[in-house]
UniProtKB/Swiss-Prot annotation:
Keywords: ATP-binding, Chaperone, Cytoplasm, Isomerase, Nucleotide-binding. Forms a cylinder of 14 subunits composed of two heptameric rings stacked back-to-back. Interacts with the co-chaperonin GroES. This is Chaperonin GroEL 1. It comes from Frankia casuarinae (strain DSM 45818 / CECT 9043 / HFP020203 / CcI3). It is found in: Cytoplasm. Its EC number is 5.6.1.7. The gene is groEL1.
Amino acid sequence: MPKILTFNEDARRALEHGVNALANAVKVTIGPRGRNVVIDKHYGAATITNDGVTIAREIELEDPYENLGAQLAKEVATKTNDVAGDGTTTATVLAQEMVRFGLKQVTAGAAPLTLKLGIEAAVEAVSAALLKQAIEVNSKETIAQVAAISAQDPQVGELIAEAIDKIGKDGVITVEESQTLGLDLELTEGMQFDKGYISPYFVTDAEAQEAVLEDAYVLLYPGKISALNEILPVLEQVVQERKPLLIIAEEVEGEALSTLVVNSIRKTFQVVAVKAPGFGDRRKALLQDIAVLTGGQVVASEVGLSLDAVTLADLGRARRVVVDKDNTTIVDGVGEASSIADRVRQLKQEIEVSDSDWDREKLQERLAKLAGGVAVIRVGAATEVELKERKHRLEDAVSATRAAIEEGIIAGGGSALTHVASVLDDGLGRTGDELAGVRIVRRALDAPLSWIARNAGLEGAVIVSKVKELEPGRGYNAATGEYTDLIAAGVIDPVKVTRSAVANAASIAALLITTEGLVVEKPAEPAPQDGHGHGHGHSHPQGPGF
């Protein structure tokens, strides 16, 4: 494809317009008085949401140069969501302000790479200051407050706190759709391990980028699978049962993988392949844990089993399996309770006799996975649109709660960023353009609080000025319209969420202000009206050529 190019100020301004377009759509949702955004879908009902990353993912601009800017801003939201699970709107607002102030400096003649050094130094100082302010999360009440703020629903906060109280801080929480109204919490036998799908073509839910298998068979194999004829017999048996299949193996590659991918794309049958967790003897032990949980067998020569001789009786079963790019969660395996209890007892004995701290730690991880179970929160609503929106908020709340447990909490409502900006007042000893870079971050840190106030119908600059006069920890509660001790009032944010928002916003802003040229594909010429001789072949599938 031929390319078109633009350079210098024109390139940077086009990127800024793209960033602004996306940020303007997202920032109206920030704060307790934030509004919703309605997203049209090519299929099904429209989505109504106030989740920043959900809105950002839907935005594509017509102008190719501006679209590059929008995609960079989208990266801020998605990266923050991946790392911390929340704070995507805050990150987007920060990025917009840093880009705005940064481009003003570049236009005035500042050296972009020197500005970048100042921005990076400022982010490091802010991150350290936020960690210093962190308050450890160790009570059920605090966990409930974190979740309630994220979901904007006290009932959700109580439910997530109850779930973590029952399964432990390292336990697994999944969110499922329910046919009934309201919220419901259920504890089930289950396990999660840190390996995701081998190929994204296995995804069944494109929006969540997950593969979800209901009432699935589970094949456990400690070796590599590359030849199709090795797994063909078991695939044929599973297809006849009309059930999905989860394959957990050291590796699935070559002819075997391509066949599974083709069948998944064509929806001949539902299958997901993931790499087995761990290495060496630990991998074998983890596979055996999964076998006990699902009531299956590890297909290994040591027990007289080979892949081409596997029957359905050798496979495990689970009510539900959820696989994303990083994790696999198995819920409600059909393994016998007595077998699971025996395995738990065995692990406890191994922990007692182990004389290696590393081995003991890994055994305790296995015990937590096997004995902790999975908390399933079922969410229902009157309409499909409301159901999707509530499920999004619940998933964000679970992620925010995990982030809070990991690094602690600080005062929310944007006030922590406004107060922590004071560490940059002296310019960190920088001079010239580096000092200008520090000041870019310093000015941008007020933006989240300003927009929380503006969405509540107030003048942002006035609220920011007033909050700066208050002690750290105190700020403006937009839900009640009062200046108060935010931590005591339960208006709190996870430190990890806030740090990620600042770091990711600064990263993209620094990239954008150091950009000097853009290269995009030239738009295709419109086809002639009679349709002869042109335009044929443009409807071929975009994936592999099947």
